[in-house]
């Protein structure tokens, strides 16, 4: 079945230690084989896979990129009078149409990170229970500005917020919000975690805060995967279904 209208936005590679197993190349190959138009990489607390990810996708898009480059050269030649043709305007329009068609066929690498968000400030490391805890948050770059802001957030999480894990906080997220899309994440996310603890008013507060900061770029994440492995934590699936019901209600 063609999966072109479905894209994975929460994905861990082998760079998510103890949580991801798949290599970047195999993930991309599988997504392409399934007819998907793109895939995100959102490793835990780091962006170590991104260079390998973008390089491999560029390699897979090599043929298409070559055609686009040739068409753009031809457009420039026609517009510069270096290539003669009966109807220059029509020829340029045809080339531009082909460029758009080819660009739509390119596989899209979506750069992201599943960050850890400190309940208080990222620099608070006093040994209190709150400082040892953290919430998961999927953060995606939707443009170049978002990519640079994501790099700043992740870098600062390591250099200033590290306490058991590299952490950011709400203040930093608001400071570097431009160009970012955020998702509420798995059961480790702030909203799901508060729902499972019965802290519904706190869960609503978190939703309202993220909505006020990120607007239409904030999404509540539903998860429906059921593990078939005997050793898996099957309680997590039932718990996620209960969380899903509440998330749908909030949305």
Features from the language model and the residues they span:
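Phosphodiester-processing cores and adjacent nucleic acid-binding clamps
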Residues: 1-251
């Amino acid at each position: 079945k063609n999966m072109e209208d479905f894209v994975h936005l929460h994905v861990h590679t082998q760079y998510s230690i103890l949580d991801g197993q798949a290599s970047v190349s195999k993930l991309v190959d599988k997504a392409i084989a399934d007819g998907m138009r793109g895939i995100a990489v959102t490793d835990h607390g780091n962006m170590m896979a991104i260079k390998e990810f973008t390089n491999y996708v560029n390699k897979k898009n090599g043929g298409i990129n070559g055609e686009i480059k040739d068409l753009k050269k031809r457009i420039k030649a026609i517009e510069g009078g270096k290539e003669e043709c009966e109807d220059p305007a029509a020829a340029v329009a045809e080339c531009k149409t082909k460029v758009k068609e080819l660009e739509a066929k390119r596989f899209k690498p979506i750069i992201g990170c599943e960050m850890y968000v400190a309940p208080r400030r990222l620099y608070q490391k006093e040994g209190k229970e709150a400082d040892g805890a953290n919430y998961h948050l999927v953060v995606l770059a939707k443009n170049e500005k978002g990519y640079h802001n994501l790099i700043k957030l992740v870098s600062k999480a390591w250099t200033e917020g590290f306490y058991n894990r590299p952490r950011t906080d709400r203040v930093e997220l608001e400071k570097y919000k431009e160009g970012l899309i955020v998702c509420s994440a798995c059961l480790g996310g702030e909203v799901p975690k508060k729902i499972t603890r019965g802290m519904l008013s706190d869960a609503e507060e978190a939703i309202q805060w993220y909505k006020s900061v990120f607007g239409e770029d904030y999404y509540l994440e539903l998860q429906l995967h059921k593990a078939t492995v005997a050793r898996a934590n099957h309680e997590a699936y039932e718990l996620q279904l209960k969380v899903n019901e509440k998330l749908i209600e909030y949305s």
